[in-house]
Design a protein with these regions (language model features):
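Short, glycine-rich, amphipathic interfacial segments at transmembrane boundaries or analogous
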Residues: 42-78, 136-154
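Cytosol-/stroma-facing membrane-proximal "stalk/adaptor" domains immediately downstream
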Residues: 128, 138-187
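Glycine-rich flexible loop motifs, especially short His-Gly-Gly/GGXG/HXGH segments used as catalytic or interaction
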Residues: 1-14, 43-44, 68, 144-165
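Short, solvent-exposed loop/helix junctions and linker helices
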Residues: 2-5, 21, 76, 87-91, ...
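A hydrophobic, helix-centered structural microdomain
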Residues: 1-64, 171-222
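Short, hydrophobic secondary-structure boundary micro-motifs
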Residues: 28, 42-43, 70-71, 108-110, ...
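Positions in alpha-helical segments
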Residues: 14, 42, 80-84, 116, ...
């Protein structure tokens, strides 16, 4: 029964949000266009319910600057002053309300991450896709980008198992407080969260590093 109620809340909430914030949306779009040009909206394929892909919308926060070899510069160098403000205030997320109206996302749920992460989850972590992704979620009010991927996914799965009207109301209320306080926006010393490599890739990297260290020690002995 709650999924039906949740969808009604999503439609009403996203619709009201777009109406209330329409002057902000228009104003920010103009500012981004003046500073960075087109496109104003950043569109990227993300996995949704049961891993099905959809295009997620956000306000653009970075330039497309590249080095002499045509390779994109690091995120920290491409993130503009306006982009930093949009991220710290979470205003870059406002266009996701269109995704909520379309039914790709919910107001509350695990955040939609990158498509390549689907192959890197453990079976337990993959359970985060048993519900629609959200504009905000349980992990976002419990550390956001200052906690590890493993902690974040554990919180996502906990939400899947405990989703309810009152929990969603609590998350929305706490999100408003966190946004006002600007907590947990990014990991220390980084413009964006480090890429999730997955448990098995991490284990392989550790083994590879151990092999290299062992080989180096053998060379020293020889």
């Amino acid at each position: 029964m709650y999924p039906v109620i949740k969808r009604c809340i999503d439609v009403v909430g996203a619709g009201l949000g777009l109406v209330v914030f329409s002057p902000v949306l228009i104003g920010l779009a103009i500012m981004i266009w003046i500073q960075m040009g087109r496109p104003v909206i950043f569109k990227q394929m993300r996995p949704g319910l049961q891993g099905r892909s959809f295009f997620m919308y956000k306000f653009r926060t970075m330039t497309d600057e590249r080095d002499e070899n045509g390779v994109l510069l690091p995120d920290e160098m491409r993130l503009t002053r306006l982009g930093k403000f949009l991220r710290s205030s979470s205003l870059d997320e406002l266009p996701e309300l269109f995704n909520v109206l379309k039914g790709d996302m919910s107001l509350v749920g695990p955040r939609p991450l990158l498509m390549q992460y689907l192959q890197r989850y453990t079976p337990e972590q993959a359970r985060r896709h048993e519900v629609k992704p959200g504009v905000t979620g349980w992990a976002q009010i419990n550390g956001r980008n200052t906690i590890s991927w493993e902690e974040k996914f554990a919180l996502d799965v906990w939400y899947v198992d405990n989703c309810s009207l009152w929990l969603d109301v609590k998350i929305l209320f706490m999100t408003a407080i966190k946004v006002f306080q600007r907590e947990g926006i990014s990991a220390e010393g980084a413009a964006t969260m480090q890429e999730f490599m997955g448990y098995y890739e991490k284990q392989y990297s550790k083994l590879h590093l151990n092999d290299l260290q062992a080989a180096a020690m053998q060379d020293d002995v020889d």
